[in-house]
Amino acid sequence: MERMELIAPCHFGLEAVLKREIQDLGYEISNVEDGRVSFYGNAEAICRANIFLRTAERVLLKVGSFKAVTFEELFEHTKKIPWEKYIPKDGKFWVTKAASVKSKLFSPSDIQSIMKKAMVNRMREHYHVDWFEESGASYLVRVFLMKDIVTVGIDTSGVSLHKRGYRQLSSKAPITETLAAALIMLTPWRKDRILVDPFCGSGTFPIEAAMIAANIAPGMNRSFTAEEWSNLIPKKAWYDAIDEANSLINDDIEVDIQGYDIDGDVVRAARENAKEAGVDHLIHFQERAVKDLRHPKKYGFIITNPPYGERLEEKENLPGLYREFGDSFRNLDSWSAYMITSYEDTEKYFGRKADKNRKIYNGMLKTYFYQFLGPKPPKQKK
């Protein structure tokens, strides 16, 4: 397949992290917008992006972009896209998702049905058939309208990329794997420094940190929709990407990554998830309350997603919980703490104003990534 444009959606506020990841894979960025990064690549890039990107939600193959303010325009422009170039005669195809922002066309169901009709019309004319069996591979179309500009892509990932395949057991409000990885990558943490999550839940932060430290690609243990696209991507491209990922793993390393939680059942679930991810030997999990958080090591990192009170009765406990967290952190005077939370009184009860603060959307929930910075460790004498 010739050079194409790919679109990688991500969490709002984390585009710079994903952009850096894509550049590290060797691909040229074509555009950065709120919640997505576009780049150029080939068939191999589809495989490598799905397997290696830690912070993308999925990878879309861009097939068209045009302006439409009426359903007639939407139909005609959709019909002009050379769908036969991407979808074989036996392919299963539908518009699985439509999103519209500040556009005249705003009904997702209408957008989906009109675009599907236009696709069928185009492909009927090309394949000279009246109906399609749709017995082959799946081609899921996603469309996004922003200020009347329609962007059309075919989803190469299928299930969202935050589904790494290791989370068998979950705590009640887990952070997604893609968001956890992005937040870790926003910090200056490196594998030679201790990392502790005192509210580890099902273990997402420690597991993602261990996978980063051991250079384990996040998409190695799952499948992707585009694996079945034999008309576009040779199987060898997938095998080569997996071989590359395997060759880069270095899990024979010394790291100090720890996860604590007050709930023993949750800690056991975290251990099982770490085992599924192949990093259980790199993480120490322990049942421990945040008021008992202490450590003899210096210059450590806390990266965590503390409770922020989804339910009213939980909200009443938050001042005490954040106060305990702040008291424990003050005793770790050389450490840095990074926490994502939507709790508006975080700084008040934590007892310290954040050195940096970043707004991040976790789905539709507005959260803040508070950064409480400790001193830098002294440079080692050579």
Residues of each region from the PLM?
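Non-catalytic nucleic-acid substrate-recognition regions in nucleic-acid-modifying enzymes
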Residues: 2-139
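Residue-level signal for inorganic ion chemistry
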Residues: 22, 95, 143, 305, ...
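Short, charged/polar, Gly/Pro-enriched secondary-structure boundary elements
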Residues: 44-51, 159-162, 378-380
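Class I S-adenosyl-L-methionine
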Residues: 96-98, 144-186
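A short, flexible beta-alpha/helix-coil linker loop
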Residues: 100-103, 160, 307-311
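Conserved S-adenosyl-L-methionine
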Residues: 175-295, 310-311, 317
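C-terminal catalytic and target-recognition region of SAM-dependent MTase-like enzymes
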Residues: 289-382
